[in-house]
From Swiss-Prot:
Domain of life: Viruses
Organism taxonomic ancestry: Viruses, Varidnaviria, Bamfordvirae, Nucleocytoviricota, Megaviricetes
SUPFAM superfamilies: P-loop containing nucleoside triphosphate hydrolases
Protein name as annotated: Uncharacterized protein R776
GO molecular function: ATP binding; ATP hydrolysis activity
Gene3D superfamilies, per the entry: P-loop containing nucleotide triphosphate hydrolases
Pfam families: AAA
Disulfide cross-links: none
Organism: Acanthamoeba polyphaga mimivirus (APMV)
Length: 314
């Protein structure tokens, strides 16, 4: 009986090893085939977030809705997105395109016609490039895409990408119109700032009770002028004046640097005894980058002297 058990265990082990070895050989053959015999272009989400988002969205148009199994609840409604896997789509101009979605990457393949000789592979690679160019020209325009970054330690995180929302002009309040007029003057007078030797940036303090439209106004500014948003958290891990200045210096020109609920953030800093972040450090950070709109949001209908001083210095 013992001998039979040993034989069974040994056979099972050999079977598992054979299965693993066969699986590795299959993967090696598959990788060799796709890497050397197919036209191939790889798109990394961390390096090309806009293009990755655009092609993934385009791919979702061709895929049956039953395959949209990944849930995204960032927003007012739940959205079902594409899960990782292998897909194929048929385009009118570029024929069949195969897409492998894995590990935050999209790997696009195109099968060469007739033969696998280099000229055919090059031809199909060019067709892949034309497909990517067409998606980029349509879906990656400033008026079609907004990037929203959040601070993560001493870096800006992978962006949240959104399609611009449309706002009815009739829904704008008098105060909102006043702010938009101010931003419009700022955006149209860069040359005037330069001629006067003034720093080209604009600081705004939006204040009011929660739900009065401060965040919505930031979205309107972002959409109207094609500006990406950078959300700064003063209480993130390892935050200090030097990290604050480094983050601000890495914000791209023609963007909005936002500090939401600055009153609550400063209260939290004081409550935690955080002495690494100071008002002086905040002002120094905001004093550096050019071509930005700085927006501080304060959740109260009354601004005290302290916040008025910050507004004046901005």
């Amino acid at each position: 009986m013992s001998k039979l058990v040993k034989t069974t265990v040994a056979s099972s082990a050999i079977a598992i090893i054979s299965y693993k070895l066969g699986d590795q050989i299959f993967n090696l053959i598959g990788n060799f085939f796709t890497d050397n015999l197919l036209a191939k272009i790889e798109i990394d989400s961390s390096l090309n977030p806009k293009l990755f988002f655009a092609i993934k969205t385009e791919l979702e148009k061709f895929v049956d809705s039953s395959k949209l199994l990944k849930i995204n609840d960032f927003g007012s409604q739940i959205r079902y997105e594409l899960n990782v896997g292998f897909y194929k789509i048929k385009t009118r101009k570029h024929g069949w395109i195969f897409v492998n979605y894995v590990d935050n990457k999209l790997i696009l393949y195109k099968l060469p016609k007739i033969s696998f000789f280099p000229p055919q592979i090059k031809k199909q690679t060019n067709r892949l490039k034309k497909f990517i160019d067409s998606v980029h020209s349509i879906s990656c325009r400033p008026d079609e895409m907004r990037m929203c970054y959040t601070s993560n330690n001493n870096n800006w995180s992978y962006p949240i990408i959104r399609r611009p929302c449309k706002f009815l002009d009739s829904n704008l309040t008098t105060e909102m119109r006043s702010v938009l007029k101010d931003v419009d003057v700022f955006m149209r007078n860069e040359d005037t700032y330069r001629e006067l030797g003034a720093n080209y940036r604009r600081g705004m303090l939006l204040y009011g009770e929660s739900g009065c439209g401060k965040t919505g106004l930031i979205s309107i500014i972002s959409n109207k002028y094609g500006m990406d948003s950078y959300i700064l958290n003063l209480n993130s891990k390892d935050m200090s004046d030097s990290v604050l200045i480094s983050l601000a210096s890495n914000v791209k020109a023609r963007s909005i640097l936002v500090i939401e609920e600055i009153d609550k953030q400063i209260e939290t800093l004081n409550a935690n005894g955080n002495k690494n972040v100071s008002i002086g450090g905040l002002l120094s950070a905001l004093d550096g980058p050019q071509g930005l709109a700085h927006v501080l949001c304060y959740n109260d209908s009354q601004c005290d002297i302290f916040f008025q001083q910050i507004t004046w210095k901005l």
